[in-house]
Amino acid sequence: MSEEIKKDDLQEEVEATETEETVEEVIEEIPEKSELELANERADEFENKYLRAHAEMQNIQRRSSEERQQLQRYRSQDLAKAILPSLDNLERALAVEGLTDDVKKGLEMTRDSLIQALKEEGVEEVEVDSFDHNFHMAVQTLPADDEHPADSIAEVFQKGYKLHERLLRPAMVVVYN
């Protein structure tokens, strides 16, 4: 019996040793795989970070370019807003009766040269065909009738202007309602 116990103990030791060796081999293989997997994961992570940083840089450059174009396009906005009251005064002066022909001609030439300079910068007069709340400000309303349909403009108190598609000043109008 003691021989059997010894054999069993010996066999258990051999099995335990084999199991330990197998476990050690598996453990040794796992760290190698894990290190490779970790390296691949880190490489993927760095690649993703690089791609995101590159895309962000391209977006910044695109936005910067668009902002420069917008600034260039609307660079004369403040100057145009400052000139519009002078243009209004010229219009009022031309509306005065009793001006000599020479004075009237001089005022018209000055007005026309200002309008031309503003047009070259992209400033346009707002159209007053029919009322549009985006471009017109109703300062008074009149009742609509058969001759004057609703939302038609009766009178323009002050002209409106826009720079390209951006409104500088709405036209102040009387509207049939």
UniProtKB/Swiss-Prot annotation:
GO CC term, one of those recorded: cytoplasm
Region Disordered: start-end pairs: 1-26
Bias (Acidic residues): 10-26
Primary localisation category: cytoplasm
UniProt KW keywords: Chaperone, Cytoplasm, Stress response
Listed transmembrane segments: none
One BP term from GO: protein folding
Pfam families linked to this entry: GrpE
One example GO MF annotation: unfolded protein binding
PANTHER family per record: GRPE PROTEIN, GRPE PROTEIN HOMOLOG, MITOCHONDRIAL
Quaternary context: Homodimer.
Job of this protein: Participates actively in the response to hyperosmotic and heat shock by preventing the aggregation of stress-denatured proteins, in association with DnaK and GrpE. It is the nucleotide exchange factor for DnaK and may function as a thermosensor. Unfolded proteins bind initially to DnaJ; upon interaction with the DnaJ-bound protein, DnaK hydrolyzes its bound ATP, resulting in the formation of a stable complex. GrpE releases ADP from DnaK; ATP binding to DnaK triggers the release of the substrate protein, thus completing the reaction cycle.
Family stated for the protein in its record: Belongs to the GrpE family.
Protein's name in the database: Protein GrpE
Organism: Streptococcus agalactiae serotype Ia (strain ATCC 27591 / A909 / CDC SS700)
